[in-house]
């Protein structure tokens, strides 16, 4: 029997984290669909007081209606309006997002990008390692897949492009004892490689900022930066102040913002796709296609070999991404549940 050798590319969206939280039965206190609902619990780094999302700390977001406890649809509409305005501003000839602006949506954008960082740091600290171990012991589909690929000698490499800010993926791999490389940072020969084009709560400047002087800057100075200025620190704590925030909010069109680190990582994601051959596999997991940069995902799709094997894991088998994939690739399979993943690649 000839052993099949393949490279695996996995592209992940918010759905995998939602699936994990559902498995943990923590959907209420770790709500990844409504990003404002738990905003009053998020700590303000300067003094550790809960209430990051408040009139005092985020006046522009508050004026636009962002409140702890609001409904998901309203929260998503507020974020969509803010990011749409920021996208247009970032690509205009006189971008107000680059400097001080009196526009409430641009002010809200600067509040949002920083609030999201500390929201996900708060969520990360709420999930204990013992809980992740229980999920693995319970044979969660994604963890079973990672274990199989790690021990499969026919699998040459596993590259994971994730648009999630959280580090639940990295922590799961850590509990599994799987070594990985964070692309764009220190190189190593790990079989597993992770690429985060939209940033991460684990990315921070090497030199920390002054915690007591923490505040929201309403200009470009706190956004972007070169990759060389950043390190990966998975001991994410709210009192470790990064001088730059590299995270791009949901639906933020990354190529408009001219962030050096984001553009480099975005280009690397295309390169990962271009390297794949016919015998290789691509898995899209929990990617809505609406809450990420659609043009960025299209760039990955159009970089793939049309004969590559494509799998999608998403509860909605009639979603837009599936329609796009089926129009481009003939070798396409859709799974509605992650439980099936542990049984893949048994050949």
Task: Cite the ranges covered by each PLM segment.
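Metabolite-binding pocket within alpha/beta catalytic cores that recognizes anionic/polar moieties
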Residues: 20, 133-194, 202
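Acidic, metal/cofactor-coordinating or nucleic-acid-engaging core segments within structured domains
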Residues: 50, 220-277
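Short, flexible loop segments at boundaries between secondary-structure elements
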Residues: 44, 186-203, 308-325
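Gly/serine-rich nucleotide phosphate-binding loop at the start of the catalytic core
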Residues: 1-156
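Short secondary-structure boundary/capping segments
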Residues: 23-35, 174-180, 212, 299-300
């Amino acid at each position: 029997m000839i052993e099949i050798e393949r490279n695996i590319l996995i592209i992940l969206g918010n759905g995998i984290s939602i699936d994990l939280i559902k498995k943990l039965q923590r959907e209420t206190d770790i709500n990844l669909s409504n990003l404002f609902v738990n905003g009053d619990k998020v700590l303000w780094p300067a003094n550790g007081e809960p209430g990051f999302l408040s009139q005092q700390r985020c006046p522009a977001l508050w004026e636009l209606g962002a409140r702890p406890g609001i409904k998901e649809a309203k929260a998503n509409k507020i974020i969509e309006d803010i990011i749409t305005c920021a996208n247009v501003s970032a690509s205009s000839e006189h971008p107000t997002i680059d400097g001080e602006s009196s526009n409430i949506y641009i002010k809200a954008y600067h509040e949002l990008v920083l609030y999201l960082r500390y929201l996900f740091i708060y969520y990360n600290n709420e999930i204990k390692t013992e809980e992740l171990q229980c999920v693995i012991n319970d044979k969660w589909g994604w963890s079973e897949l990672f274990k199989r690929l790690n021990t499969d000698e026919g699998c040459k490499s596993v590259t994971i492009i994730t648009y999630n800010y959280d580090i639940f993926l990295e922590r799961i791999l850590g509990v599994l004892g799987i070594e990985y490389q964070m692309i764009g940072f220190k190189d190593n020969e790990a079989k597993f490689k992770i690429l985060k084009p939209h940033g991460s709560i684990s990315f921070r400047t090497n030199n920390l900022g002054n915690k007591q002087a923490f505040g929201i800057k309403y200009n470009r100075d706190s956004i972007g930066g070169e990759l060389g200025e950043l390190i990966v620190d998975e001991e994410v704590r709210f009192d470790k102040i990064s001088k730059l925030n590299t995270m791009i909010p949901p639906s933020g069109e990354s190529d408009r913002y001219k962030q050096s680190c984001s553009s480099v990582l975005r280009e690397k994601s295309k390169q990962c796709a271009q390297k794949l051959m016919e015998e290789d596999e691509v898995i899209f997991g929990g990617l809505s296609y609406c809450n990420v940069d659609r043009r960025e995902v299209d760039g990955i799709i159009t970089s793939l070999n049309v004969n590559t094997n494509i799998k999608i894991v998403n509860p909605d088998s009639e979603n837009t991404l599936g329609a796009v994939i089926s129009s481009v690739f003939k070798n396409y399979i859709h799974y509605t549940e992650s439980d099936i993943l542990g049984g893949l690649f048994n050949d």
